[in-house]
């Protein structure tokens, strides 16, 4: 590692006395690890808790980059920052499973959860019925009619296979009933929450029994107003009431239509039309970051048949309703005075019955309407159980919305594993959210990278104690190594499990794992039971374990993945044009995946994020990673390629958002970016244009609208050509 002197430590924010002590301990660690791998030095730095959450981020940066200064990423893969101990690994869900069944399914090849993980995962791919028969016993799932078998792959019309054929259940009931394993009692905390602005108040707690009674009350009210099978939308923040409504709709045999609370009226209307929703649950306003935003008025502009409207706080609405709409208070009062209004007999259905209509983010055209059946919650809960290690006693928080796939994933993953769901009714961007994480004792914190960047840059979480967190999770976009370094450091370098998947998969196809070492911004494994290959430009799979970059192809037997779309051709979208592999037609996902040395995966954007520069295909994500580090004034960049108006090779254009308080010139950045790209990627690449903007266009789920930027640049070049 690079030598770190007292002067360096003082520059990083320590006092002279602190720096001297720090250096002595560091020297002791380095001397003790002489001749050992840099990762062993970092492992010891973390184990001794030399770096503390209260230390300046500059100090964490200094040590991490000094330890790994001579690390060769090209031959060794990304640097490791978290290492499972054998003792820790045996306490994880997967570790317990492997210790119990490892010798049975792997024979003498089984050693321990860390050594044998890759073999056990391979077993889950090759014998999914055996794996699922084991894992389903770990979740609180009860059937009214037991499945005929675990897996039926005879029906070739269902490429993803038929899981649990013949079984009948109600998945919402499974969330609400006490169970002996996992241990869920009536008095177990099901949900903890706090309203924004009440940061010094006690955290609110809802027990499993209280949740069940609330859900059953709403289920009775739904029965009084709708017919079985009706689609009913939810467009509101993910509050306790939203969770109650979601579960009640499913418990009573209706179908949830998930709509994000950030959508404009036109987008709401599209989703109501496609789903044929009979009504919508919404709020009068949204309170976020101390500001009040109208929600009901947007919903009304979408012209729903009927709206059931909740007040943002208190019991009185702050506005006048349309004639056909009804207040939450009146909706509930229709049944609250009836005998046994808190009791309800669930509507039991076959396992493949529709329960939820979700939508793709819709970066182009009409969003795909993706049906979730009762299998989908089983898939996402099993993956969260295995990879993020959600279990009884955990408090699980992930700022999201029921309109996006992470909302239902969070809900089912918590309740089916016995964890407590943690909800903050307000903006996750400020100190109030962080204090809720501290006060509620969150042990699993899910994030999106842009949220982490905001926390780090604003320093809004300073002084808070997040050390009860045992694991972080991240999804939605590519993670930034420095932002992840900051996040992990807030809990003494606990692991961040990266997750990448899709609504139609009801899960992530690549993730991290608590029985493997982890690297920032990288995925350590394909998910349990998931088979995949990386394809070259001719659609031929690279050999397993070979370092490569290409489009990912998923094995078609993907339990829990949807086999139909409500407004598109599932076969055309996910299978048409994909190559065969060992007689199987691969499933399209659209990600460009890099398999690194060391066996990690890094997502290089979507297949349509690739560009052709001078005849060389490259990933825009790769270029952005280099340019983001090229100048200290840069907050983030987006790379697009645009063909000149007169034709010819594509030109590289960089859009830039500067950090607050920083200024720069496009021409200066153009030179810096070109130099950085030529040094780090390819000497033949150069930046043709740089455009500084205030922010990037994104979808409501925070996906970058690269197409919009590309179209803007095409228009600008066209105008320039006419001058």
From Swiss-Prot:
The keyword Cytoplasm applies. One of its GO terms (cellular component) is cytosol. GO terms for molecular function: ATP binding; CoA-ligase activity. Keywords: ATP-binding, Cytoplasm, Ligase, Nucleotide-binding. ATP binds at residues 360-368, 498-503, 591, 603-606, 703. Its main location: cytoplasm. Residues 499-558 are annotated as: SBD2. Residues 429-498 are annotated as: SBD1. It is found in: Cytoplasm, Cytosol. It comes from the Eukaryota. The keyword Cell division does not apply. Its EC number is 6.2.1.-. Belongs to the ATP-dependent AMP-binding enzyme family. PANTHER family: ACYL-ACTIVATING ENZYME 17, PEROXISOMAL-RELATED (PTHR44378), ACYL-ACTIVATING ENZYME 18, PEROXISOMAL-RELATED (PTHR44378:SF1). Both substrate-binding domains (SBD1 and SBD2) are involved in the substrate recognition, and are sufficient to confer the substrate specificity. This is Probable CoA ligase CCL12. It comes from Humulus lupulus (European hop).
């Amino acid at each position: 590692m690079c030598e770190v002197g007292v002067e360096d430590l003082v520059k990083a924010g320590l006092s002279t006395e602190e720096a001297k002590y720090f250096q002595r301990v560091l020297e002791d660690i380095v001397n003790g690890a002489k001749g050992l791998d840099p990762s062993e030095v970092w492992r010891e730095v973390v184990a001794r808790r030399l770096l503390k959450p209260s230390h300046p981020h500059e100090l964490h940066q200094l040590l991490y980059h000094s330890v790994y200064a001579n690390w060769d990423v090209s031959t060794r893969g990304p640097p490791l920052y978290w290492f499972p101990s054998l003792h820790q690994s045996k306490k994880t869900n997967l570790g317990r499973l492997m210790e119990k069944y490892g010798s049975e399914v792997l024979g003498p090849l089984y050693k321990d959860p860390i050594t044998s993980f890759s073999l056990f995962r391979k077993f889950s791919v090759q014998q999914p019925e055996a794996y699922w028969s084991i894992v389903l016993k770990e979740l609180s799932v009860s059937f009214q009619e037991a499945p005929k078998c675990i897996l039926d792959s005879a029906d070739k019309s269902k490429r993803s296979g038929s899981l649990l054929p013949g079984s009948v259940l109600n998945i919402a009931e499974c969330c609400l009933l006490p169970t002996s394993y996992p241990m869920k009692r009536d008095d177990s905390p099901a949900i903890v929450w706090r309203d924004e602005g009440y940061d010094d108040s006690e955290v609110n707690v809802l027990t499993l029994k209280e949740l069940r009674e609330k859900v059953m009350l709403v289920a009775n009210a739904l029965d009084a107003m709708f017919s079985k099978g009706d689609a009913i939308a939810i467009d509101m923040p993910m509050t306790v009431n939203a969770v109650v409504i979601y579960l009640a709709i499913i418990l009573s045999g209706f179908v949830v239509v998930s709509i994000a609370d950030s959508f404009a009226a036109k987008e709401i209307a599209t989703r109501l039309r496609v789903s044929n929703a009979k009504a919508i649950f919404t709020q009068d306003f949204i309170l976020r970051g101390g500001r009040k935003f109208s929600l009901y008025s947007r919903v009304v502009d979408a012209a729903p048949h009927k709206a059931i409207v909740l007040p943002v706080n208190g019991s009185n609405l702050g506005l006048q309703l349309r004639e056909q709409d009804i207040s939450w208070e009146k909706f509930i009062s229709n049944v609250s005075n009836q005998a046994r209004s808190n009791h309800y007999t669930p509507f039991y259905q076959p396992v493949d019955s529709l329960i939820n209509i979700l939508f793709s983010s819709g970066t182009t055209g009409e969003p795909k309407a993706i049906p979730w059946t009762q299998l989908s919650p089983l898939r996402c809960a099993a993956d969260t159980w295995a990879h993020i290690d959600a279990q009884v006693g955990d408090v699980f928080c992930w700022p999201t919305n029921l309109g996006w796939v992470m909302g239902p994933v969070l809900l089912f993953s918590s309740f089916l594993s016995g964890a407590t769901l943690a909800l903050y009714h307000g903006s996750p961007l400020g100190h109030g959210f962080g204090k809720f994480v501290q006060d509620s004792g969150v042990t699993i914190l899910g994030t999106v990278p842009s949220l982490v960047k905001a926390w780090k840059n604003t320093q809004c979480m300073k002084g808070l104690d997040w050390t009860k967190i045992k694991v972080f999770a991240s999804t939605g976009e590519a993670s930034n190594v420095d932002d992840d370094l900051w996040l992990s450091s807030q809990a003494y370098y606990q692991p961040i499990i990266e997750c990448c998947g899709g609504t139609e998969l009801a899960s992530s196809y690549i993730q991290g794992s608590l029985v493997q070492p982890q690297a920032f911004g990288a995925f350590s494994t394909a998910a349990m039971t998931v088979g995949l290959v990386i394809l070259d430009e001719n659609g031929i799979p690279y050999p397993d374990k070979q370092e490569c970059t290409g489009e990912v192809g998923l094995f078609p037997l993907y339990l829990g993945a949807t086999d139909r779309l409500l407004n598109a051709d599932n076969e055309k979208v996910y299978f048409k044009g994909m190559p065969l592999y060992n007689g199987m037609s691969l499933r399209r996902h659209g990600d460009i995946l890099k398999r690194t040395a060391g066996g990690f995966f890094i997502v290089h954007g979507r297949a349509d994020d690739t560009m052709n520069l001078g005849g060389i295909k490259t990933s825009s994500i790769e270029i952005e990673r280099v340019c983001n580090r090229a100048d200290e004034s840069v907050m983030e960049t987006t790379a697009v390629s645009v063909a000149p108006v007169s034709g010819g090779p594509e030109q590289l254009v960089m859009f830039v958002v500067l950090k607050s308080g920083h200024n720069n010139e496009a021409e200066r950045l153009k030179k810096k970016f070109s130099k950085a790209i030529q040094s780090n990627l390819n000497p033949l690449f150069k930046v043709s244009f740089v455009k500084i903007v205030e922010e990037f266009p994104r979808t409501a789920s925070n996906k970058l609208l690269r197409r919009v930027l590309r179209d803007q640049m095409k228009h600008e070049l066209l105008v320039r050509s006419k001058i």
